[in-house]
Amino acid sequence: MSAPVGIPSLLLALCALLCVLNAVRSAYCPDPYKRYSDQHSYCVGVCCSCAKYRRGVSPWLKKELVRLHNNLRSKVAGGKSHSVDHLPRATNMLEMVWDDELAEVAQRWSDKCERKSDCEDCRRVGRFGVGQIIFEFDGKMDGKDMENEFFSRFMALQSFRKEQVARFTAGTNPKTAQILWAKTWRIGCGFLDFNYPGNGRRYTQIVCNYGPKGNEEGEEVYKAGSVCSSCPANTCCGDACKKHNLKANYHGLCKVIDENLPPEGNVPHKKTGNEVFYCGFNDESDCRHTVEGVDRWIRNVTTGGTWLNTYLGNYGHTVIEVRSAHHLQVRQAMPGHQDPQWTHGGRTTLSVPAVRGFGGGRQILNLTHLPPCRR
């Protein structure tokens, strides 16, 4: 009779099997993620060297995370606590909802057992850039731990200043700013209870991804003024939600009516210098454009806004001409790669060459998003 297989041997066998399964899983990496980063968190697989006790966000934790975020935002936006009397009320802060794609990317990164954030491009999704906060607890976490964490975040607001609301800078607390960022309205998180290989200690980690990302240098965290007075289109607030057969659960927050469409501003957008393209790419005359070369520009309406996308094959080239030059602003479009070229001289155009070696000889350009052009 053979001796029983020891527990360490079983663990090694299970780990080996897990690595094989993750190699198979990681072999599939959607093209958009590849274009953002060859180390995209969705695609890099998990760490086999850390022992995992639990993984994945439970239905209860999913609801709790959304509730805790919205409770904190509501207290600030609606001024419903003496602890935030020094901060202005918010006119445009959105109610957060759960996002499965953000959650899946966050879970993939959490499974790496890294105890640090991934890179911005590593977690980006097609609809928007993604912010991130990691909540970490020693040992096993319970519901009170998460409540206490958000209570400490709330108390930290006492040191958050009015001028920091008006303009985000490097000195602003980034976690507080991201939680309060008015235009961020989608959240998805990953959960892992594990032994960290670096010191052998047990931790519980919740990685939360936020979109559209906040903490944009020079921009306001939220717009100060009368509560809900600048709620964007496709949102409602308070009793106004009843006519849409919706219930406003959080005082002072603008609730998105159709979660498949973006909330878009009902006031003119103030240019910040961060725009790639200041145009909603709708059908208004001042947004019209013509294309020379590869005509694969596609208008996509997403939860992150309206995008004009193009995909170029090897050696492809496209030129897009926009009728109104005052709608254009430029930023570096593909850091680390060849940038598209703006040309002037009677025309306002964007010339985009394909770059070999980038995404397998492929290049994609997104021209973004923002409110529709105004007559």
Curated annotation (Swiss-Prot):
InterPro entries: CAP_dom, CAP_sf, CRISP-related, V5_allergen-like. The keyword Glycoprotein applies. It is found in: Secreted. Keywords: Allergen, Disulfide bond, Glycoprotein, Secreted, Signal. Gene3D superfamilies: CAP. One of its GO terms (cellular component) is extracellular region. It comes from the Eukaryota. The keyword Nucleotide-binding does not apply. Glycans are attached at residues 300, 366. CDD domains: CAP_euk. Contains 9 disulfide bonds. Expressed by the venom gland. Disulfide bonds: none annotated. Residues 66-210 form the SCP domain. Residues 1-26 form the signal peptide. Belongs to the CRISP family. Venom allergen 5-like subfamily. PANTHER family: CYSTEINE-RICH SECRETORY PROTEIN-RELATED. This is Venom allergen 5. It comes from Lycosa singoriensis (Wolf spider).
